[in-house]
Amino acid sequence: MAGGHKKNEATRQTDEVIQQKYDESLSKHKNRCELSLTFEYKLSNKLRARLKAAFFKVDHGWEDQTLDQVETLVRKENHVHRRSRSINDLDSSKLRRPHHPNSIMGSNTGKLRASSFTRLVSPREGFAQLPYKKPVSPYSSSSAVSSTSSSFDRTSPPWLNYVEPHTELPRLPFELSHASTASAKSPLFGMNYHISRPEETDESLRLGTANLSRIRKSTSLPFPTAYPLSADDCKAAEVMLTLVNSMPSKKP
């Protein structure tokens, strides 16, 4: 048993050595093939270049010069040509103008470029050319408000021209006496709207006038003016008052 085991071990070691040697020889052969291919490739390129130099020599009548001299001259010419082509490419890229849809055959590109540069450097200069309107103070005079609104009407849409009336009252078919700042202690509290009737007595008119003058002095606000009524308006007011008085009052 021991002899057989040793024999198998020796056989296994021999196989490993053989496999290792085979791998080494295979890698060497592979490297040799790669080197030969590289050498052949370089040699073929060199032969091809010398063949071109020979044709170039014959075409230009340089029979008195060797192939090495011709290759040197060709290499210099190629270098100069490559350099001049790169310079021409740079010049053409500098002269190339960007296309703009609003320009006709690129005639306005200089102006557009200058205006865009100005906007980038100082963007506020573009806003300085726009029409500027000073905002109107809420406490300014009525003339200034009217002039501003008239100028605003010409340049703004219709829905911006509406101004809520603060100082005018609607016209009614009868006279109104309105105290807008009446408080709980005011004699007109609870009856802010007073309809003047033709049947009122002189005493009530006198009391109402005294109360109104007292309120005007205390509040120092302009009292709304009364509009004159026509005969038809007076008749309509009388009919309304008659209807109101004819309604039955609730007894306590």
Curated annotation (Swiss-Prot):
Keywords: Cytoplasm, Meiosis, Nucleus, Repressor, Transcription, Transcription regulation. The keyword Heme does not apply. InterPro entries: Srl3/Whi5, TF_Nrm1/Whi5. Residues 1-15 have a biased composition (Basic and acidic residues). It is found in: Cytoplasm; Nucleus. It comes from the Eukaryota. One of its GO terms (cellular component) is cytosol. One of its GO terms (molecular function) is transcription coregulator activity. GO terms for biological process: G1/S transition of mitotic cell cycle; meiotic cell cycle; negative regulation of transcription by RNA polymerase II. The keyword Transcription regulation applies. Residues 1-23, 84-110 are annotated as: Disordered. PANTHER family: G1-SPECIFIC TRANSCRIPTIONAL REPRESSOR WHI5-RELATED. Has a role in meiosis. Belongs to the WHI5/NRM1 family. This is Cell cycle transcriptional repressor whi5. It comes from Schizosaccharomyces pombe (strain 972 / ATCC 24843). The lineage of its organism: Eukaryota, Fungi, Dikarya, Ascomycota, Taphrinomycotina.
